[in-house]
């Protein structure tokens, strides 16, 4: 009798396994919900790194006077002279 029973179970395993797994999962889900109790209060979402960066950039921009800009001639002086004046003998 046992060999016949095992043959039937092996043949119909997909049809037996899903309902058993479904029942075990549902019982586990409800048991966990019962043990855990009420849901905790929602926590305020923290600002993302991108949002914090944008806020910081906006704060920095508010403190600056955008009418005062550095001229392009002054900006060129910060580059290494060896690179910019290599082929210009009048600047050496």
Curated annotation (Swiss-Prot):
Q: Does the keyword Transmembrane helix apply?
A: yes
What's one GO-annotated cellular component?
Answer: membrane
What does the UniProt entry say about where the protein is found? Membrane
Q: Which UniProt keywords apply?
A: Membrane, Transmembrane, Transmembrane helix
Q: Which InterPro entries match?
A: UPF0767
TM annotation in the entry:
15-34
| Membrane topology field | Single-pass membrane protein
Q: Which PANTHER family match?
A: SMALL INTEGRAL MEMBRANE PROTEIN 12
For this chain, the family text in UniProt reads: Belongs to the SMIM12 family.
In Swiss-Prot or TrEMBL terms, this protein is called Small integral membrane protein 12
Instruction: Supply the source organism's classification.
Output: Eukaryota, Metazoa, Chordata, Craniata, Vertebrata
């Amino acid at each position: 009798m046992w060999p016949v029973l095992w043959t039937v179970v092996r043949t119909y395993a997909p049809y037996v396994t899903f309902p058993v797994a479904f029942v075990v999962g549902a019982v586990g889900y409800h048991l966990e919900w019962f043990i855990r109790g009420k849901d905790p209060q929602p926590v305020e979402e923290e600002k993302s790194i991108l949002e914090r960066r944008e806020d910081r950039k906006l704060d920095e921009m508010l403190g600056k006077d955008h009418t005062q800009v550095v001229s392009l001639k002054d900006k060129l002086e910060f580059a290494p002279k060896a690179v910019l004046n290599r082929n210009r003998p009048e600047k050496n």
